[in-house]
Design a protein with these regions (language model features):
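Small-molecule-sensing regulatory modules
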Residues: 1-39, 45-48, 52, 136-279
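Short, well-ordered beta-strand segments
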Residues: 4-6, 75, 93, 120, ...
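Short, structured active-site "lid" loops
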Residues: 47-74
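Short, Asp-centered acidic motifs that coordinate Mg2+ and/or phosphate
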Residues: 72-76, 118, 159-160
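A conserved helix-loop-strand patch within extracytoplasmic ligand-binding domains
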Residues: 79-82, 88-137
């Protein structure tokens, strides 16, 4: 069986696609797996804020188009970049085991930043929460791949940049992490640290294959967080975060807890339920 995996062309996206390819080969050594790297508008236009070109959804749209028109069989995304609603004809067929959900600083620890220091981030969610924690800081926009972001932290006009900790772990750059922020302090982006593996909804054979790399607890947490985002009527650009965890009392039932900040001030919500509908 041949499986073509569509992904963005960035080093992190390629790592993620190669990781899923490895999981599939482990599940079925006879598979012929090919990674198809695509350039997306979000990757090409790093000179403008994401909000001006359609938000984080621009990273997913062109990769999803490759699925819908038959150029690829599977798409691998950072789950945090996906809008809350999946396009008609596609399905998130697998969520592999999730990585680190936390945000992190490169360049300086949060508590050590002096008043009026500059923190670079392209995320409204991160900016809102950091401004709530440290209203004395200043913020600048940040775009580009991880190498660009790390380089930005070394410039004289920026004192720290905010990244997803998991990205540096996956790229072998964990030694550049200066301050990893607990999820209780800095609520992560919905589905941060998770991968979403999409395929066409009518491809029964491929859906069965992808079910073999599913991680049940990660899926339940990601589904709960995405349901939270959907209820807010937002997409992945909404300045709201959520972190769901499977409570140890009854793992099979999938109870979870979540919290989320929103941009008009910071509103934090903690809740518990037995499924995404309760969240």
């Amino acid at each position: 069986m041949r499986v073509r995996i569509a992904t963005r062309a960035s080093p992190l996206a390629r790592w993620q696609a190669d990781h899923v390819a490895g999981l599939l080969r482990s599940a079925d050594p006879d598979l012929d797996v090919e990674v198809v790297a695509l350039s997306t508008e979000g990757d090409r236009r790093t000179d403008v804020p994401l909000s001006e070109i359609g938000g984080k959804g621009v990273f997913a749209t062109e990769v999803q188009a490759a699925l819908l028109d038959g150029r690829a069989d599977v798409a691998v995304h950072s789950a945090k970049d996906l809008p809350a609603r999946t396009p008609d004809g596609l399905v998130i067929a697998a969520v592999p085991e999730r990585g680190d959900v936390r945000d992190a600083l490169v360049g300086c620890r949060l508590v050590d930043l002096p008043t009026d220091d500059v923190v670079a981030t392209g995320s409204a969610r991160r900016r809102v929460q950091l401004a709530h924690l440290r209203p004395d800081l200043r913020f600048e926009d940040l775009r580009g791949n991880m190498a660009t972001r790390i380089a930005r932290s070394e410039r004289d006009d920026v004192d720290a940049v905010v990244v997803a900790a998991v990205a540096l772990h996956r790229l072998g750059l964990a030694d550049r992490l200066t301050d990893v922020l607990p999820a209780t302090l800095m609520v992560p982006q919905v589905a941060q640290g998770a991968l979403a593996v999409e395929c066409r909804s009518d491809d029964a054979a491929l859906r069965e294959l992808l079910a073999g790399i599913e991680h049940a607890a990660s899926r339940r947490a990601v589904d709960a967080e995405r349901a939270f985002l959907s209820e807010l009527g937002g997409d992945c650009t909404l300045p709201a975060g959520a972190h769901a965890t499977i409570l140890p009392t009854d793992d099979d039932a999938g109870p979870a807890a979540s919290a989320g900040p929103v941009a008009s001030g910071v509103l934090s919500i903690d809740t518990q339920g037995t499924g995404t509908a309760d969240m």
